[in-house]
């Protein structure tokens, strides 16, 4: 019985080892001839619009917001390694024709083009979708404790968030976004009361970990004041999507801050 158990464990470890090295194995044993035939500019078979530019180990897309992706061909399958790894079954490949099946099961037909003017579609690539975007809100607030000057400023950081989506051919592609930092400065008659730079990680006790990993701090703004405090909303959400969490910040005139989920 012990011998069978040991053998079973060894088999499982061997299978796990094979799975862990499968990507590296595929790359080292890739179909170099198929890869060479893919080099160049490809257009959609139906309308001749530029679809992708293959150069070396990378595929570039005409949408300037889409990140280039590494690729290889192994056993008649085109593998794309972006945020996620996907394989697309090649149905037919010739020097000027490529047919493969996308993730929806639809056939994609691409034709190689020698039109050099189409290369301009691949000449520009943005670093991130929201690079250099800033938001500011300066507000004078009247309360029972006097006037407060609220300064909110939101700007991008160097922290990257990758969001996967699908292009017109049903192929998964990646867009890169930069996370934001929200700065709050609160003064009472010119005297500093509260100052802090907020990042999304500070709200991990209120937001699921997986969601927080895929999201950015999108907005922060003043909402209202009462006799005891000033209130702000912080919006954390998936880039370019409606899915968000809203956190309410409560700042008292003596500089104490608390937060809760709306």
Which sequence ranges carry the predicted segments?
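C-terminal motif of bacterial Sec signal peptides marking the signal peptidase cleavage site
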Residues: 14-17
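Tryptophan-anchored aromatic micro-motifs
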Residues: 26-50, 125-141
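Surface-exposed loop and turn segments in beta-propeller and other repeat-based domains
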Residues: 193-212
């Amino acid at each position: 019985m012990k011998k069978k158990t040991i053998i079973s464990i060894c088999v499982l470890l061997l299978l796990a080892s094979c799975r862990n090295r499968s990507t590296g194995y595929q790359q080292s044993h890739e179909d170099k001839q198929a890869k060479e035939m893919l080099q160049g500019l490809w257009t959609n078979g139906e309308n001749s619009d530029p679809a992708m530019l293959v150069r070396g180990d990378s595929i570039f897309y005409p949408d300037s917001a889409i990140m280039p992706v590494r690729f290889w061909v192994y056993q008649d399958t085109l593998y794309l390694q972006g945020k996620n790894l996907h394989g697309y079954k090649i149905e037919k490949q010739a020097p000027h024709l490529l047919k493969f099946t996308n993730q929806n099961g639809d056939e994609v037909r691409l034709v190689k083009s020698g039109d050099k003017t189409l290369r301009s579609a691949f000449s520009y690539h943005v670093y991130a979708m929201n690079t250099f975007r800033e938001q500011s809100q300066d507000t004078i607030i009247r309360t029972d404790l006097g006037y407060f000057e609220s300064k909110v400023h939101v700007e991008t950081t160097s922290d990257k968030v990758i969001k996967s989506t699908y292009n017109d051919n049903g192929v998964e592609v990646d867009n890169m976004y930069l996370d934001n930092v929200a700065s709050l400065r609160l003064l009472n008659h010119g005297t500093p009361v509260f100052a802090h730079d907020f990042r999304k990680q500070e709200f991990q006790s209120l937001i699921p970990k997986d969601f927080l990993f895929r999201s950015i701090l999108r907005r922060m703004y003043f909402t209202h004041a009462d006799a005891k405090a000033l209130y702000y909303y912080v919006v954390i959400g998936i880039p370019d999507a409606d899915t968000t969490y809203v956190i309410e910040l409560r700042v008292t005139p003596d500089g104490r801050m608390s937060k809760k989920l709306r």
